Structure formats: structure tokens, C-alpha cells
Regions:
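The feature marks the mature, well-folded catalytic cores of soluble enzymes
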Residues: 1-351
């Protein structure tokens, strides 16, 4: 980008977080009651962090949603039609330069044409753009928000397994991706990691399930140090080593790995690294597992200046994702003033 915009790190001050409400027409149907409860707890936690919520809701579900929310909650309901609720991967990203902020979007094709994404891919231009001060800039590249992690210095992380899936961008090379990340997102350096993948992950190894930055040159890594006999142990140990080699000056915090299977015996990709940072708070997924307590302790060590807020995400991981996957932050300076003003009125529906 000639304007020298750079993708903002997640800990940049936020006006809001966007979510897409689960309903019976999504894949959440078997766990709908439990999943809605998780969303309501996330909304409550975000409001306590002084973060507003932009909530996409199908028009037929708005009445039910209003009944479940407290009238005083700072939530703006926006009518939208979407394929799925994983808004991390199709919601717009936010870049900034000295002049201001710029929302940007990539093409979303259902994680390499695995699932229909025709509705999700239109959400930014058809729905969310109405809330933004600037038009949402579109890039001719298939990419997902969960595949990108950046710090305040412009160091960007992604994973080779995800980027090289030929159903995303054909045979596009890593070198070509790195040039695009520099041009589109202002990345000063892009490290594409070769190791790490969780069983049951449909995304081909999104970085937000594996490695996250801290503001103090730290790396929080989903490891399996507590399970040396686990099928993930070698791959995640190699990921830790790879991060040490690429970023030797970073302090590393390894998270334990829980073991969760669904009733069909499938391993679920439960990751403690799939947390959401919002205004000096971190909403940290827990899974009602023995490892939860240790994971929270490690998170507090990694982010000493943040309040760690545990959220039970066991219902979310039944659909092979977690907390970060269902959310996307909106930094201060993106939303129109009248949109921000609407949050002061409690729950409202955007007209």
C-alpha cells in the first residue's frame, strides 16, 4: 500500500469487537443453547472491559437475541445473512498510518473451498462498511484473519500449511506471500512457520491456534510439553524450536495441551492460544479440563499488565474452533461517530 498502512496488533485500543450470533441455521444446531450462553458471557466480559459489541444477527433471530441481552448492555445489533459465525476469518482487518485508520479485507473462500462462504465473503462490503468512517479496501488475495498475527513492530507470523493450500491462491510461493503482506499490511518482516497443526483443525493450521505475540517481545505458544506421549508432542515441540530459532530475543511461554474428543471419538482442536485481547483484558478459553488452571497462570505470566478472564469454550470447540475464531476486534478510529454514540443507549438495532 502506498499509504504506508500497517496492520494493528490486537492490543491496540478498541472501540468494539464484532461477533456473529449463532442460530439454528448454522452448524451450531446440536449445541445451540450452550453456545448462545457462551456468546452472552463473552458479550458481558467485553462490556466489562469497556469494549462495545457489534453483533451480526439474522433478521429472523433479532427478537430472540434481544430477549437474551440485558437492555443496558452496549451492543449494536446489525441485521446480516452469513454462512457461519467464524467472523475472525471474514471480518475486516484494521490498519493504521500517521493519518488515521483503514479497514481492509481479503477474499474469504471457506478455508480453501472446504465450506460455502458466498454470504460471508459479502459481509464486509454489504453490511459492515456502513458502520465504518472509511470504505473497506479490498485486496485480490485469499486470506483469513486467523492466519495472521502481527506485533507493534510489523513482525508478522503465519503458517506454511495454511498459505500453501492450492485451493486458496493456487501455487502462490511463500516469497510472493511475504511481498503481499509487506504491500497490503505493512509487514516489515513475515515469518512463515513450517511446524504445528492441531488435529480437527479445518483451517490448515491457523496461527491463532498456535503462536501469539505479547506486547513485551514474548511468544505464547500452544505446546504439548505436558503430554509427551500425545500425537501432537513432536510437531508442537518443533514449533517451539522453530520460533526460538527465528526469534531468539523473544521470551517463550508454553501452554499445556488439553485432550478432548467428541462423542464420535474425534480429537477436538482445543487451544489455549485462541484467546482474545481487548482493552487490557484477555478473554482466555478454558475447556473444563485439568490443564485450565495452569494455562491461566501461564497467560498471567505472559501478560502481567492484562486482566485474564476465563471463558468456558467447551461448547465452541465442538465445532472445531474457539474464542478468537468467533471474534474480530475493531480498533478506535474505525467506526463512525454516530455508531459509537449508539452504544451509549444500551442494546439497539442498527437501521
Amino acid at each position: 500500500m502506498t499509504e504506508n498502512y500497517q496492520l494493528l496488533p490486537e492490543w491496540a485500543q478498541q472501540d468494539a469487537v464484532m461477533l456473529a450470533w449463532p442460530d439454528k441455521s448454522t452448524d451450531w444446531q446440536p449445541w445451540l443453547s450452550e453456545v448462545k450462553s457462551v456468546y452472552l458471557k463473552i458479550i458481558e466480559a467485553l462490556n466489562q472491559a469497556n469494549t462495545n459489541v457489534v453483533l451480526l444477527v439474522r433478521s429472523s433471530e433479532i427478537s430472540d437475541c434481544l430477549d437474551r441481552l440485558k437492555k443496558s448492555q452496549k451492543v449494536l445489533i446489525v441485521s446480516a445473512d452469513y454462512n457461519d459465525t467464524w467472523i475472525r476469518d471474514y471480518g475486516f482487518l484494521s490498519c493504521a498510518n500517521e493519518s488515521g485508520l483503514q479497514p481492509v479485507e481479503f477474499i474469504f473462500n471457506g478455508w480453501g473451498q472446504k465450506f460455502d462462504a458466498s454470504k460471508d465473503n459479502k459481509i464486509n462490503q454489504n453490511v459492515l462498511s456502513r458502520l465504518c468512517q472509511q470504505p473497506i479496501k479490498s485486496f485480490d488475495l485469499v486470506a483469513e484473519g486467523g492466519a495472521l498475527e502481527i506485533d507493534q513492530n510489523g513482525l508478522l507470523l503465519s503458517t506454511e500449511l495454511c498459505l500453501t493450500n492450492p485451493k486458496r491462491n493456487g501455487g502462490k510461493s511463500i516469497d510472493s506471500y511475504q511481498k503481499d503482506f509487506q504491500q497490503f499490511l505493512g509487514a516489515k518482516q513475515s515469518i512463515i512457520l513450517q511446524n504445528g497443526h492441531l488435529e480437527g483443525d479445518d483451517t490448515d493450521g491457523h496461527i491463532d491456534t498456535l503462536v501469539r505475540f505479547t506486547p513485551n517481545s514474548g511468544l505464547v505458544i500452544q505446546s504439548a510439553f505436558n503430554r509427551p506421549d500425545d500425537s501432537h508432542f513432536q510437531g508442537l515441540a518443533a514449533l517451539v524450536k522453530e520460533c526460538q530459532q527465528h526469534m531468539p530475543s523473544h521470551e517463550i511461554f508454553e501452554l499445556p495441551l488439553p485432550y478432548i474428543v467428541n462423542p464420535q471419538g474425534e480429537r477436538l482442536p482445543a487451544s489455549y492460544a485462541n484467546f482474545l485481547i481487548s482493552n487490557q483484558h484477555i478473554l482466555c478459553p478454558i475447556y473444563q479440563q485439568p490443564e485450565d488452571k495452569l494455562a491461566i497462570q501461564i497467560m498471567q505470566n505472559a501478560y502481567p499488565e492484562f486482566s485474564i478472564v476465563p471463558i468456558n469454550c467447551l461448547p465452541l470447540v465442538q465445532q472445531f474452533g474457539s474464542l478468537h475464531c468467533i471474534s474480530m476486534q475493531i480498533p478506535c478510529g474505525i467506526l463512525k461517530p454516530e455508531v459509537l454514540q449508539s452504544f451509549n443507549n444500551g442494546v439497539s438495532v442498527y437501521e
